[in-house]
């Protein structure tokens, strides 16, 4: 492997090859890349997945560890670059992979600079499929983080923020200016962690289905939405009464705890 300075000079040279249609903005700030990997807290026995490895900014620091590490990207040329960069590291496995279809099971740590246009989709897949994951560290556009971290009553509060609350503790870690990338995006980024809890994946999937159903028409009341989801207004009224949720509340006015009460009654 080449030294760090030469490596990141090479990363910066990929600016002209960046594909805007798939959100390629290569991280060129070495300190930021090193911090992101350190936030992952890799330990002996971990199996690590990097999503969207790109030109290898995070991969360089991941390669300092001896644990098995899979790097996936949809860009064949970049995967070939990383296979060459890390050909002497038998634990590093660069490969073609689409995060929207790649199997997430078996990984204890997941990291990635997530493309803006599929940030929500990738996180949804992780939350509903990464059964063994204990920690994830992700960089997203700042506006995306604010949507993902939306609280009750906020216009962005909805199924995915609630699913995140159910599956993990979300912590804001680091602001990353747009100047840290080449080519520079139009907005600053932010790094956050997800520390996953022991809540059941199947229960998370059932909860997410309910949430998507009752948030289908955000401005309608929970009674209207739940009636549509269940196709039974009387059952919806009974469940809401038992859950102590007023009929006139809107979906964004209902807490995770209330939704979990409702879900329990539905399952019973």
Identify the function of each model-found stretch:
Residues 1-213, 252, 261:
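Catalytic cores of RNA-modifying enzymes
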Residues 86-87, 153, 230, 244, ...:
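Residue-level detector of secondary-structure transition/capping positions
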Residues 127, 227, 267:
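Short, locally clustered residues in the helix-turn-helix/winged-helix DNA-binding domain
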Residues 190, 194-196, 202-238, 243-258, ...:
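An accessory alpha-helical subdomain
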